[in-house]
Swiss-Prot record:
Residues 1-25, 80-100, 159-195, 260-272 are extracellular. Glycans are attached at N5, N6. Keywords: Cell membrane, Disulfide bond, G-protein coupled receptor, Glycoprotein, Membrane, Olfaction, Receptor, Sensory transduction, Transducer, Transmembrane, Transmembrane helix. It is a multi-pass membrane protein. Belongs to the G-protein coupled receptor 1 family. Pfam families: 7tm_4 (PF13853). This is Olfactory receptor 2G6. SUPFAM superfamilies: Family A G protein-coupled receptor-like.
Length: 316
């Protein structure tokens, strides 16, 4: 997106759902509601994991990292989207678009890797229980989490830097809800074969490879769980892993639809709704799924709330 396009002066026109005013008003309320719940849910999950010593384990360390990524990821999109939907002028500044491009892609890529790391953690816990503490050493866990954040940053710098260099020849209308790499590549007025190939490679590395690793991990996990003699033990193991698997299917499925499916095979509105799903809906699902399906988290949350209430009444 070179400055000769005047994009840096005029910004980009985000059409979103402006051609359907009633739908846009409805989505505004839904997105605002989901965003607030996502912030509250993920923040509560981070606080519980930090404040309750019983949750100072690798699983909850990665879960708190996931919640942190989700808060940042949805915040990189939702506020701008709400502002744009609530005003007549749908223009987004050039700098805002570029910043959103880098941040959203970096955080989304980090979450892709982090979910695979969490699958490995579950594999180690279920299939290597006697060596679990030795395998998932705190330094190793920190390295895995740091690697997930760093890998997202690196791929974002590479992919987005290539994208912003594309000449747009004055084109500044984005028929989408926010600035995203596939949409900006389509706006370019030159051959984008290299950019599309690079995006495809990045998508394979950050989507297909993690999904395959997760499936392999859960294959071993399923075998190990079926060998557990205790019905209660099997139920607990399946409950923990199924929660993670639900998040994985929803998150990867929607992003694969957006990034690996040819654009001519989906309608413009399909792409918009799919983008809403992995930027707004999925970050809300994580705290709900992990809280409602996890007795440890529910117990810790209950203790935290009751403790705060007791402390407040004692002061009074």
């Amino acid at each position: 997106m070179e400055e000769t396009n005047n994009s840096s002066e005029k910004g980009f026109l985000l059409l979103g759902f402006s051609d359907q005013p009633q739908l846009e008003r409805f989505l505004f309320a839904i997105i605002l509601y989901f965003y607030v719940l996502s912030l509250l849910g993920n923040t509560a999950l981070i606080l519980v994991c930090c404040l309750d010593s019983r949750l100072h384990t690798p699983m909850y360390f990665f879960l708190s990292n996931l919640s942190c990524v989700d808060i940042c990821f949805t915040t990189s999109v939702a506020p701008q989207l709400l502002v744009t939907m609530n005003k007549k002028d749908k223009t987004m500044s050039y700098g805002g678009c570029v910043a959103q491009l880098y941040v959203a892609m970096g955080l989304g890529s980090s979450e892709c890797i982090l979910l695979a790391v969490m699958a490995y953690d579950r594999y180690a816990a279920v299939c290597r229980p006697l060596r679990y503490i030795a395998i998932m050493h705190p330094r190793f866990c920190a390295s895995l989490a740091g690697g997930a954040w760093l890998s997202g940053l690196i791929t974002s710098l590479i992919q987005c830097s290539l994208t912003v260099q594309l000449p747009l020849c004055g084109h500044r209308t984005l028929d989408h809800i926010f600035c995203e790499v596939p949409v900006l590549i389509k706006l370019a007025c030159v051959d984008t074969t290299f950019n599309e190939a690079e995006l495809f490679v990045a998508s394979v590395v950050f989507l297909i490879v993690p999904v395959l690793l997760i499936l392999v991990s859960y294959g071993f996990i399923t075998q190990a769980v079926l060998r557990i003699k205790s019905a209660a033990g099997r139920q607990k193991a399946f409950g923990t892993c199924s929660s993670h698997l639900v998040v994985v299917i929803i998150f990867y499925g929607t992003i694969i639809f957006m990034y690996l499916q040819p654009a001519n095979r989906r309608s413009k509105n399909q792409g918009k709704f799919v983008s809403l799903f992995y930027t707004i809906v999925t970050p809300l699902l994580n705290p709900i799924i992990y809280t409602l399906r996890n007795k440890d988290v529910k117990g810790a949350l209950r203790t935290l709330i009751l403790g705060s209430a007791a402390g407040q009444s004692h002061k009074d």
